[in-house]
Amino acid sequence: MARVTLVLRYAARSDRGLVRANNEDSVYAGARLLALADGMGGHAAGEVASQLVIAALAHLDDDEPGGDLLAKLDAAVRAGNSAIAAQVEMEPDLEGMGTTLTAILFAGNRLGLVHIGDSRGYLLRDGELTQITKDDTFVQTLVDEGRITPEEAHSHPQRSLIMRALTGHEVEPTLTMREARAGDRYLLCSDGLSDPVSDETILEALQIPEVAESAHRLIELALRGGGPDNVTVVVADVVDYDYGQTQPILAGAVSGDDDQLTLPNTAAGRASAISQRKEIVKRVPPQADTFSRPRWSGRRLAFVVALVTVLMTAGLLIGRAIIRSNYYVADYAGSVSIMRGIQGSLLGMSLHQPYLMGCLSPRNELSQISYGQSGGPLDCHLMKLEDLRPPERAQVRAGLPAGTLDDAIGQLRELAANSLLPPCPAPRATSPPGRPAPPTTSETTEPNVTSSPASPSPTTSAPAPTGTTPAIPTSASPAAPASPPTPWPVTSSPTMAALPPPPPQPGIDCRAAA
């Protein structure tokens, strides 16, 4: 019986979405390697982190990986994490950037899987869809503890709070080995797909036979769901052909291209189209026959101008109402704040403004104060970005998912309850200047024989001579002081005090007390 050769047939797609200004996802799909990274950190930092990690894994896509697949994946992930740390050291402004990672290294009938963060891996086998990764998120811990159901987690306001990611700091990814079978279909996706699209709908799209059409359909579904985030997918089939694909596919931030699908006819799609549209002015040469131009009557022209004015005014009022009813948690001037509006700007004007700021009492109780109050005297400590742990700090810097004011207040309370660094200890008391602390010793000393009354010296017991010459004591001389008496051997055990540990650093392993 001939040996069956298993190969991959794959497709990858990435889209910026309808809300984000740039694409921070990066994806690589090749004959041996499928890898997807969802960057975070705001501005260009997320793009940098995801590109560095994908670049560190790309060399695994060789002709025959063989050997220990998990060891190779682990080494490549650590190299990518070290690259992030080195980049932050060169550019301190990138501190807080990070990325998720879900990757598969394929070798015949087996594959290695590495995962960290909230990007996901799915397996479609025999018509059944199974999630093969576990989200490293705060909401997933609530599900594990039985506090909420998986259905409630799907719409939980804190679903984007990541507990583990590649940020340049030491972290252990999840590594597993799996068996590959002919007919299996694997899906890697960012949370831009799994958040707005249900598993049932994902299953329907994955049942499309062609991998490219299936990937295209998944992106389309995410955009129709509002496209709140970058969305990236890899769809790969395990097939028993003699030859599979060999040309790798790059998409997202790592490709340098802005892959955008035709925007859906939804409110979010139309809003995104308005922000992206660029006017192209074409020069039209003058026509020779100017008399053939239709002439509009003054009444019709006035009607058109009035109609356009009404529509523009209505659009502005509706847009203003939508913006003013939207709230999200983000960094503002170094403080964790609730912002009103949406991220970004239009024609040079900011579309958001600070609304409330978190304030911590000495007993660590959270209250919200208006932005106008933050400039005056306070009986609480403003909740600073540096008070948060690094993963949550990166999330807030990028901006948490928007919603109602109650949603944003809930996010703020969740951060105060679960994401703060421990308070810095009070400074140690020091000795006053000029009074050094005495050394700590333990001694056993025998007295000198000259000081013992039980053994008087013969010279001191003789009577003093009489005469004009004054007696000179044998124990002292005015010209030269007597040397100190020689003691018996002394046993000394000095106790060396241990050096105190280095003090915690605010913003790194502790926060300033309220």
Curated annotation (Swiss-Prot):
One GO cellular component term noted in the UniProt record for this chain: membrane
Please give the residue ranges the record annotates as the region Disordered.
Answer: 420-514
Binding positions (Mn(2+) 3): 118, 160, 191
User: Per its UniProt record, what Pfam families does this chain match?
Assistant: PP2C_2
E.C. number: 3.1.3.16
Mutation: residue 5 to A; reported impact is: No change in activity
Listed GO biological process terms:
regulation of DNA-templated transcription; signal transduction
Result of mutating residue 38 to G?
Answer: 90% loss of phosphatase activity
Q: Which residues carry this modification: Phosphothreonine?
A: 137, 141, 174, 290
The record places domain PPM-type phosphatase at 9-238
Compartments annotated for it: namely: Cell membrane
Claim: Phosphoprotein is one of the keywords in the record: yes
Output the superkingdom of the source species: Bacteria
Query: Transmembrane segments in this chain: where?
Result: 303-323
Keywords (alphabetical) are: Cell membrane, Hydrolase, Manganese, Membrane, Metal-binding, Phosphoprotein, Protein phosphatase, Transmembrane, Transmembrane helix
What does gene deletion cause? Answer: Depletion of PstP compromises mycobacterial growth and causes marginal elongation of cells. Depletion of PstP in M.tuberculosis negatively impacts its survival in mice and decreases the bacillary load even in an established infection.
Q: Which residues lie on this side of the membrane: Extracellular?
A: 324-514
Give the cofactor note.
Binds 3 Mn(2+) ions per subunit. The third manganese ion is unlikely to be involved in catalysis but contributes instead to stabilize a flap segment, which is partially disordered in the absence of bound metal.
Q: What does this protein do?
A: Plays an important role in regulating cell division and growth by reversible phosphorylation signaling. May play important roles in regulating cellular metabolism and signaling pathways, which could mediate the growth and development of the cell. Plays a role in establishing and maintaining infection. Dephosphorylates several proteins, including the kinases PknA, PknB, PknD, PknE, PknF, PknH, PknJ and Pyk, the transcriptional regulatory proteins EmbR and EthR, the osmosensory protein OprA and the dimycocerosyl transferase PapA5.
Protein name, entry field: Serine/threonine protein phosphatase PstP
Gene source species: Mycobacterium tuberculosis (strain ATCC 25618 / H37Rv)
Q: Give the encoding gene's name.
A: pstP
